[in-house]
């Protein structure tokens, strides 16, 4: 348990940041899931639209420090290649 005033404030800030980060992480997962489902259904147009929506969300999470920048880039790259494969 925090004893000093500054430690109590730090605890409050951490709790607030954790909630925000959790929300962002969940949001990213939902967008990625929509792309995965569209790929699984085989609908190229739907998958491309879902990827277009997921891409900025992943970049935003990376810029906010929720996920590592390389992780975001890797996920986008792999999803994009799978969406592109649907068109072939």
UniProtKB/Swiss-Prot annotation:
Pfam families the UniProt entry points to: Ribosomal_S20p (PF01649)
SUPFAM superfamilies: Ribosomal protein S20
UniProt keyword annotation of rRNA-binding present: yes
Function as written in the Swiss-Prot or TrEMBL entry: Binds directly to 16S ribosomal RNA.
Domain of life assignment: Bacteria
Protein name from the UniProt record: Small ribosomal subunit protein bS20
GO CC terms: cytosol; small ribosomal subunit
Entry keywords, A to Z: Ribonucleoprotein, Ribosomal protein, RNA-binding, rRNA-binding
Family recorded in the similarity comment: Belongs to the bacterial ribosomal protein bS20 family.
GO MF: small ribosomal subunit rRNA binding; structural constituent of ribosome
GO BP term, example: translation
């Amino acid at each position: 348990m925090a004893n000093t005033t500054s430690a109590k404030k730090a605890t409050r800030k951490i709790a607030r940041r954790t909630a925000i980060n959790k929300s962002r992480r969940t949001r990213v997962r939902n967008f990625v899931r929509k792309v995965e489902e569209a790929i699984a259904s085989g609908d190229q147009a739907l998958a491309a639209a879902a990827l277009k929506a997921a891409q900025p969300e992943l970049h935003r999470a990376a810029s906010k420090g929720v996920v590592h920048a390389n992780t975001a880039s890797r996920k986008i790259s792999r999803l994009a290649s799978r969406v592109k494969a649907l068109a072939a």
